[in-house]
From Swiss-Prot:
It comes from Rickettsia rickettsii (strain Sheila Smith). SMART domains: RPOLD (SM00662). Coiled coil: none annotated. HAMAP family: RNApol_bact_RpoA. Belongs to the RNA polymerase alpha chain family. The N-terminal domain is essential for RNAP assembly and basal transcription, whereas the C-terminal domain is involved in interaction with transcriptional regulators and with upstream promoter elements. GO terms for biological process: DNA-templated transcription. This is DNA-directed RNA polymerase subunit alpha. Residues 251-340 are annotated as: Alpha C-terminal domain (alpha-CTD).
Length: 340
C-alpha cells in the first residue's frame, strides 16, 4: 500500500526564512523563503498576500462627534475644510490599541494652526502612529473640539456597518480601515538545491503602519492559514509513516546531507570532491587544520564552509558517534525530509 506520508515527505521544504528590514524604517521588510517546490511560490505568495491584506486584527477610528454638527454635510466655523473633508483626513489616522474595548479620544485646538493627529489626547491605551497627519486648518481665534471613538476590528468596514443602534445624536459613523498591513507585493524567482536549479524562491515585500512589525504580520497570516486548513486533514498517519519519526539517530540527520547539495563556490566544491568528502558528516569530522592541508583549499573556502555549517549548528572537529553508518544511503533517503 502506498505510504500516505510520501505525499508530503517527498516534497522539498523551505529550510530558511530571511527577514531584511529597510534601513529608513522598521515598518517595511523583505521576506525571502526558499527552497520551495515548483509552483509553490505562487501558491503560498498569493495566499499569504490575501490573508495579510484582509484578516489581521487592528484598530481604527469608527466615529466622531463635533459639538453643533449633526451630519457630514455640515461646515465647522473657522475650519477651512468641510466635515466631509475632515472625515476623509481622520480616516487616514493610524492608531494602535493596547486593549480590546473601545476608547474615546478627545481633540481640542485653538487657531490659527494646522490641526494634526498628534494633538489628539489618547490616554495610555491608544497610540497615534502618524502624529504629523493633517486633520484640518483652523482659523485665528477659532476653537475646535472633537471626540473620536476608536475600536478594534479587521478588514475594511463601511460607516453603515459602524453605525450602532444606540449611537448618540450628533455622533457620525465613518469608514474604518482596521488592517495594520498597508501593502504586500511578492515575486517568485528560481533557486538552486544541489544541481537542480528550478525550485522556487518566494520574495515578499510587506509594509505595515507600525502597529505590528512585518515579521509578526507574516507569522500571524501563516497561523491563520494553518488554522483554516487544519480541518481538511481527515486521516491519521499509518504506523509505517510514523516510524521515521520514532527511530533515533546517534547524530544529527543533517550529517546525512550530501555536500554537493550545499550552495558552495566552485573552488570549494571541487576541493571537497577531490578529497572524497561526500557527506556533511565526513566534513565535520575534519578539523580546520585538516582542511587547510587540502590542496587548493584556502582560508576563504574555510570561512565559506564554516558559515554554512553554522546554519545547521555544526562545526569542524566534531566527534560523531557511529560515523559512517553502514546503511548510509538508506538512512540518507529516509531522513531526507529532516534536513530539506
Amino acid at each position: 500500500m502506498l505510504s500516505l506520508s510520501k505525499n508530503w515527505n517527498t516534497l522539498i521544504k523551505p529550510n530558511k526564512v530571511a527577514y531584511e528590514n529597510f534601513p529608513e524604517t522598521n515598518n517595511k521588510a523583505k521576506i525571502v523563503v526558499e527552497p520551495l517546490e515548483r509552483g509553490f511560490g505562487l501558491t503560498l505568495g498569493n495566499a499569504m498576500r490575501r490573508v495579510l491584506l484582509s484578516s489581521l486584527q487592528g484598530a481604527a477610528i469608527t466615529s466622531i462627534k463635533i459639538p453643533a454638527i449633526e451630519h457630514e454635510f455640515s461646515s465647522i466655523p473657522g475650519v477651512k475644510e468641510d466635515v466631509s473633508e475632515v472625515i476623509l483626513n481622520i480616516k487616514g489616522i493610524e492608531v494602535k490599541m493596547h486593549v480590546a474595548e473601545k476608547r474615546i479620544m478627545k481633540l481640542k485646538a485653538t487657531g490659527p494652526c494646522v490641526v494634526t493627529a498628534g494633538m489628539i489626547e489618547t490616554g495610555h491605551d491608544v497610540e497615534i502612529l502618524n502624529p504629523d497627519h493633517v486633520i484640518c486648518d483652523l482659523a485665528k481665534d477659532k476653537q475646535l473640539e472633537m471626540e473620536l471613538t476608536c475600536k478594534v476590528g479587521k478588514g475594511y468596514v463601511l460607516s453603515t456597518n459602524n453605525y450602532e443602534d444606540n449611537l448618540p445624536i450628533g455622533e457620525i459613523a465613518i469608514d474604518a480601515l482596521f488592517n495594520p498591513v498597508k501593502s504586500v507585493t511578492y515575486k517568485v524567482e528560481n533557486t538552486r538545491v544541489g544541481q537542480v536549479t528550478d525550485y522556487d524562491k518566494l520574495i515578499m515585500f510587506v509594509e505595515t503602519n507600525g502597529a505590528v512589525l512585518p515579521e509578526m504580520a507574516v507569522g500571524l497570516a501563516a497561523r491563520i492559514l494553518q488554522e483554516q486548513l487544519q480541518l481538511f486533514i481527515s486521516f491519521e498517519e499509518q504506523e509505517e509513516d510514523k516510524q521515521v519519526k520514532t527511530d533515533a539517530l546517534p547524530f544529527s540527520p543533517y550529517l546525512l546531507k550530501r555536500v554537493d547539495e550545499l550552495e558552495l563556490s566552485v573552488r570549494s566544491a571541487n576541493c571537497l570532491k577531490n578529497d572524497n568528502i561526500i557527506y556533511i558528516g565526513d566534513l565535520v569530522k575534519r578539523t580546520e587544520a585538516d582542511m587547510l592541508r587540502t590542496p587548493n583549499f584556502g582560508r576563504k573556502s574555510l570561512n565559506e564552509i564554516k558559515e554554512i555549517l553554522a546554519k545547521f549548528n555544526l562545526r569542524f572537529g566534531m566527534d560523531v558517534p557511529d560515523w559512517p553508518p553502514e546503511n548510509m544511503q538508506e538512512l540518507s533517503k529516509r531522513y531526507e525530509d529532516s534536513y530539506n
